[in-house]
Amino acid sequence: MAKELATQLIEQLQAAGVQRIYGIVGDSLNPIVDAVRKTGGSGQGGIDWIHVRHEEAAAFAAAAEAQLTGNLAVCAGSCGPGNLHLINGLYDANRSGAPVLAIASHIPSKQIGSGFFQETHPDRLFNECSVYSELVSTAEQAPRVMHSAIQHAIGLGGVAVVTLPGDIAGLEATGETPLPATFRRATLIPDAASVRELAEAINAADKVAIFAGAGTEGAHDEVVALAEVIGAPIGHSLRGKDFMQYDNPYDIGMTGLLGYGAAAEGIEDADLLILLGTDFPYDQFLPGTRTAQVDRAAHKLGRRTDVDIAVHGDVLPTLAALKPLLTPKKSRRFLNQMLKKHDRLMNKAVGAYTRKVEKKQPIHPEYAASLLDQVAAEDAVFTADTGMCNVWTARYINPLGTRRLIGSYLHGSMANALPHAIGAQLAYPGRQVISVSGDGGLSMLLGELITLAAHRLPVNVVVFNNSTLGMVKLEMLVDGLPDFGVDVPDADYAAVARALGFHAVRVTDPARIEDAYREAFAHPGPSLVELITDPKALSIPPKITGSQVLGFATAMSKVVLNRGAGEAVSMARSNLRNIPRR
């Protein structure tokens, strides 16, 4: 019996190790969906179809699976609006370097260019959020396009899009199925002269600081050993937190708007800053000091700040080559100074809201986040929504070397946490997965609670309900504007979840938080814990500029004029202990 092209393409994905496809069915996608059905699902060694409520969630779920496992993940959308819905999640995946393949089905091939019903041009639309995007025009061409898409997604680390007209997908396959060219990613060895230049700069410097990013994955011990030899404090980016914060006696926290601890000051006070595997984009937090950068991606060298020494290579072999060239530093003055400052800041600012607040209502979000860190499993996977939940998880969730924490850190989309958790739970069915959302983010893709219920995924959803878009509110105040348009209508998310069959509870008393977590995490199916948190609690960055102070003061004066002094006083009380003290 003749094989359909759609079946051939699905066989290629199976050969590449794909276990599931996230998406929503639609007429132009029917041949692909039917080919998935014929595989028998994962129970028979085939591919599962994960039916989500919105294609954006399909792309986010695939992004999380790919980001966490490093393996190819797949999503699909029907022609026109269906695959257009993928685009936000695909931006997130591509910016995160996640190997995701998207099948964008298309209108009948003879109608392309005629302004047909639901016509778009996916091969053009997805160019900006992909490393590969091609239109299939014939059955003969299709297997090679699919092969190229697989290799691009895995090899370059990003999104590959195959635009496939439904009528072509239903044609007879014309040749053998090409197998993926499996490979192991090569290690990039740095140029010896560049390493010597870096060693000379380190040996000549009095105060060296390290700032580590996601590129330090797998190099934790080596980075810590470098810090020991040269007496350097280690700051990290949010994406580097998983890989550098744990078991690190030289950790001084994180810089940036979400940052904490002494990282901002340590980076600024150094006379040599070493950027290890980071493409940290916020140049206002990068000083004008002498800077060295190590990265395997040459195009990232020097694009955020001026770099005096650029080393093109992976972090691990770079440190191996660097080690014998270094002269150990006897002085620990700078390192000890930063460690003491970090300890003081963590105690006075970050730790302030985790003490003596067991009876304070509304719930302090920092306290709730610190309890979440204590109760969660040692190998839990956390997915954090963009906004204030990013702050609370960044500051209070400890990675332990066994946990993972992901979010839309480079794209900055709201509503990512819940669909990310879907992909994480399917990738790791035996691990505890915790989605941490604000009410704003959760409500944006609220329908994905149905996806959890339908697939009986034991994701633990934690909702910080403060009835406001907290991060946007903070940004307005810093810019000198009174908060406006940031209110989120009150909704009982626990009641919604219970109606879907979740174990769900709404918590207003902080004394109930820990028990609520434990009960939810012990439940075998999906759960939701809704926390009613203080809407006036704001994230204070580790480094406050004069313009930010002026903007906040201006905004507060407008708040007083518009809503009375009581509102401003209440906001001050909610945040006073968060202000960093030097």
Question: What label would you give each PLM region?
Answer:
Residues 2, 54, 114-116, 185-197, ...:
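A general structural motif
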Residues 24, 103, 163-165, 211-213, ...:
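Generic beta-strand/beta-sheet core signal
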Residues 416, 420-457, 464:
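Catalytic phosphate/nucleotide-handling subdomain of diverse soluble enzymes
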